[in-house]
Amino acid sequence: MLTLFTHINSFVWGPPLLALLVGTGIYLSFRLGFVQLRQLSRAFKLIFREDNGQGDISSYAALATALAATVGTGNIVGVATAIKSGGPGALFWMWVAAFFGMATKYAEGLLAIKYRTKDTNGEISGGPMYYIVNGMGQKWKPLAVFFSAAGILVAILGIGTFTQVNAIASSLEHTFKISTRFTSLILAVIVLFIIFGGIKSISKVSEKIVPFMAISYILATLIIIAVNYNKIPHTFQLIFSGAFSGTAAIGGFSGAIVKEAIQKGIARGVFSNESGLGSAPIAAAAAKTKEPVEQGLISMTGTFIDTIVICTLTGIAILVTGKWLEFDLQGAPLTQASFNTVFGSLGSFALTFCLVLFAFTTILGWSYYGERCFEYLFGTKFINAYRIIFVIMVGLGGFLQLDLIWVIADIVNGLMALPNLIALLVLSPIIVKETQKYFSETKNITKP
């Protein structure tokens, strides 16, 4: 079974999709005048601006919800997995994916606001399925349907449930000897109570947990790096040389390792920051704003925080401790071992705490993404049926094989990204026009 899905994954995440993902980001970066560089400071200032339009939640709450879904096991387990199989060079390719992915995330956020609608319950609905149909026309509806179907699969079979629950359950079992099955069932009960409150309930939890968990984890990794400060130059040498010549803990010949570094780096980068996946604009659409460009700018900060900051710190912490070279360590235990070199036995507790928070908030965020995709296909009448299915899948998350879970997650991620990337390319003239109009009106010095 694992071998079959691994072959499917290699096909889905082959050169065409990787080229489309990075290529879309590169294309948008040039068309938008590298908005991710020129407007990053403005973007961070906008996060806490006063709400000025219709919507269900504040722009900050929308970003917190998106980050809740984005900052998850990919930042801890995914980075460790990428480095283990692709070597230190995988981290470089994660940076590449993130840099160009910021332009992609900007475009997604902009389109989410421009083409959002209200559902029959009076709540805001938006995301790729809406900007595909409302922006590209009804003839493109099959693409919107395909995206929504893939989004449901990602939510209930990939990022939203299995990978997160399995990471929480495995970590708690490793640290506290708690049964994975017991953990899965408890998580299912907690999630049940929260997701039935909808986006407002999810965003309230996210607003409180996300800043705390991110700051706690960043401080912990900075301490590890500071203790091993003398190894930082060599670590960066490994990252840059490994990106083009290949160095992996698992061995193999150079060409294959470089290919693995590129594939794992970009795939894990997308898994982590979700740029191009089409998930974040679903949350962005609910923001109380009337300006698409401003929400686009806010959205792209999510990729910066997730990958350029958190994933980078995870990767460097693993590399400076040298634990990535130990053959029997992979996934969460590899990151855990790196923490233990500085914090001793407390390292396991600290990482477990962070991992549980990261994964739990991702479950909440993805429950909403899947719900909106489900609503697009089946209407609001059957939303509770989706929520029950989602909770059941959470309960099953601790029963599956880790390797198989990650492979399935990668496959459905790729299927979800494809229709969204097509939409971004087709709608790129509108993205550019909206961007030029906004910066012209605000008298920005440099127009894209």
Go through each PLM region and give its residues.
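N-terminal alpha-helical transmembrane segments of multi-pass membrane transport
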Residues: 1-73, 83-90, 101, 395, ...
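Extracellular loop-to-transmembrane helix junctions
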Residues: 9-42, 84-122, 143, 306-313, ...
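Transmembrane helix-loop junctions in multi-pass membrane proteins
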Residues: 17, 32-36, 74-79, 155-168, ...
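Membrane-interface loop-to-helix entry segments
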Residues: 20-27, 31-44, 165-172, 179-187, ...
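Helix-loop-helix module between adjacent transmembrane segments
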Residues: 24, 28-29, 100-122, 129, ...
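Extracellular/periplasmic helix-exit of transmembrane alpha-helices
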Residues: 29, 108-116, 120, 222-238, ...
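Flexible loop linkers connecting adjacent transmembrane helices
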Residues: 34-58, 81-83, 87-91, 95, ...
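Alpha-helical membrane segments and immediately flanking helix-loop junctions
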Residues: 54-85, 111-135, 146-149, 153, ...
